[in-house]
Swiss-Prot record:
<comment type="function">
    <text>Catalyzes the concomitant phosphorylation of a threonine and a tyrosine residue in a Thr-Glu-Tyr sequence located in MAP kinases. Activates the ERK1 and ERK2 MAP kinases. Activates BRAF in a KSR1 or KSR2-dependent manner; by binding to KSR1 or KSR2 releases the inhibitory intramolecular interaction between KSR1 or KSR2 protein kinase and N-terminal domains which promotes KSR1 or KSR2-BRAF dimerization and BRAF activation.</text>
</comment>
<dbReference type="GO" id="GO:0038133">
    <property type="term" value="P:ERBB2-ERBB3 signaling pathway"/>
</dbReference>
<dbReference type="GO" id="GO:0005925">
    <property type="term" value="C:focal adhesion"/>
</dbReference>
<dbReference type="GO" id="GO:0004708">
    <property type="term" value="F:MAP kinase kinase activity"/>
</dbReference>
<dbReference type="GO" id="GO:0005874">
    <property type="term" value="C:microtubule"/>
</dbReference>
<dbReference type="GO" id="GO:0005829">
    <property type="term" value="C:cytosol"/>
</dbReference>
<dbReference type="GO" id="GO:0042552">
    <property type="term" value="P:myelination"/>
</dbReference>
<dbReference type="GO" id="GO:0032872">
    <property type="term" value="P:regulation of stress-activated MAPK cascade"/>
</dbReference>
<dbReference type="GO" id="GO:0014044">
    <property type="term" value="P:Schwann cell development"/>
</dbReference>
<feature type="modified residue" description="Phosphoserine">
    <location>
        <position position="306"/>
    </location>
</feature>
<comment type="similarity">
    <text>Belongs to the protein kinase superfamily. STE Ser/Thr protein kinase family. MAP kinase kinase subfamily.</text>
</comment>
<keyword id="KW-0808">Transferase</keyword>
<keyword id="KW-0479">Metal-binding</keyword>
<keyword id="KW-0472">Membrane</keyword>
<dbReference type="GO" id="GO:0048538">
    <property type="term" value="P:thymus development"/>
</dbReference>
<feature type="modified residue" description="Phosphothreonine">
    <location>
        <position position="397"/>
    </location>
</feature>
<dbReference type="GO" id="GO:0048679">
    <property type="term" value="P:regulation of axon regeneration"/>
</dbReference>
Length: 401
């Protein structure tokens, strides 16, 4: 069983969001909260645009008040998975568009109340790299978690349109994920526990944010029996049931980056034919320049994937075969010749099987790939809007390739 965490910062009482009755706030208390919040924002290393956007979100949030089921108008479904369904909804009293995650749980009232209480720590998670939180409440057998709506969706959805995500774009993704993980760890002593493409959200302003991190131990425990996955982003040490730490999140990030770069979940690794279909030319394997193996391999678990002009007809890897592969076989890697050596080395450092030898957050933040990516002007918003055919609200910089 996962250990319970306790919030390390005093809760920000911006607004009452537990559906057990609103708590009155005075004008003086609101001003004190804003001063407290201002101090917390000053502690973060934000540029002017990030600070203004975060302040704008928190100003909107302060006007929301108590969240109730009757106040929401469902617009569309955004996605499903991880034990819940996420819908795009309008909060009628405020007029705000939110992402509302509904999790159906057969639980006792005491457990439900504990989950709602534990979720309140999300009010303290104010970062440009963390999806904004409006509140959580319980209604008709469902926990509702109300979040900032990200109009670009998740990176697994973006990947379906893009087919592969360019290295310079993934550089910006890597920076955001590392900074988000560092924020959770340093400011709140929280591990994410579920880093994967579907939990990295993007929007047409070019923001990249983490969502669905393990803030509620009780919710994790309550959902454990209902989770059935076809892919795993868990580290070898976590799959083996041994002690794990933020190093496990780093493995998950590395695996996600390989998937986004090559266009599909990377276990088992693609063979030469599949890589040639994906990249449009023969791809070499490793530093020795040898071609990738042409021997047929099982395809990744889940639905068949498109290869070239047809569907992949290889037998799917069973989930137990996948987990065994992660634990016992060599880790995935990026193919040579199509990515920079810096990017390849960065991913390799994330995917070292021994967590004691795996790179930590500090080392990765100082890696040459990250330093190069920080210095590059990449129009992430423009690339995303072209890929998803979204209207772009921001000013482009350099066109991403």
């Amino acid at each position: 069983m996962l250990a319970r965490r306790k919030p390390v910062l005093p809760a920000l009482t911006i607004n009452p969001t537990i559906a057990e009755g609103p708590s009155p706030t005075s004008e003086g208390a609101s001003e004190a909260n804003l001063v407290d919040l201002q101090k917390k924002l000053e502690e973060l290393d934000l540029d002017e645009q990030q600070r203004k956007r975060l302040e704008a979100f928190l100003t909107q949030k302060a006007k929301v008040g108590e969240l109730k089921d009757d106040d929401f108008e469902r617009i569309s479904e955004l996605g499903a998975g991880n034990g819940g369904v996420v819908t795009k909804a309008r909060h009628r009293p405020s007029g705000l568009i939110m992402a509302r995650k509904l999790i159906h749980l057969e639980i006792k009232p005491a457990v439900r109340n504990q989950i709602i209480r534990e979720l309140q720590v999300l009010h303290e998670c104010n970062s440009p790299y963390i999806v904004g939180f409006y509140g959580a409440f319980y209604s008709d057998g469902e926990i509702s978690i109300c979040m900032e709506h990200m109009d670009g969706g998740s990176l697994d959805q973006v990947l379906k349109e893009a087919k592969r995500i360019p290295e310079d774009i993934l550089g910006k993704v890597s920076i955001a994920v590392l900074r988000g993980l560092a924020y959770l760890r340093e400011k709140h002593q929280i591990m994410h526990r579920d880093v994967k493409p579907s939990n990295i959200l993007v929007n047409s302003r070019g923001e990249i944010k983490l969502c669905d991190f393990g803030v509620s131990g009780q919710l994790i425990d309550s959902m454990a029996n209902s989770f059935v996955g076809t892919r795993s982003y868990m580290s070898p040490e976590r799959l083996q049931g041994t002690h794990y730490s933020v190093q496990s999140d780093i493995w998950s990030m590395g695996l996600s980056l390989v998937e986004l770069a090559i266009g599909r979940y990377p276990i088992p690794p693609p063979d030469a034919k599949e890589l040639e279909a994906s990249f449009g030319r023969p791809v070499v394997d490793g530093a020795d320049g040898e071609p990738h193996s042409v021997s047929p391999r099982p395809r990744p678990p889940g639905r068949p994937i498109s290869v070239g002009h047809g569907m992949d007809s290889r037998p799917a890897m069973a989930i137990f075969e996948l987990l065994d592969y992660i634990v016992n076989e060599p880790p995935p890697k990026l193919p040579s010749g199509v990515f920079s050596s810096d990017f390849q080395e960065f991913v390799n450092k994330c995917l070292i099987k021994n967590p004691a030898e795996r790179a930590d957050l500090k080392l990765l933040m100082n890696h040459a790939f990250i330093k190069r990516s920080e210095g590059e002007e990449v129009d992430f918003a423009g690339w995303l809007c072209r890929t998803l055919r979204l209207k772009q609200p921001s000013t482009p910089t350099r066109t991403a390739v």
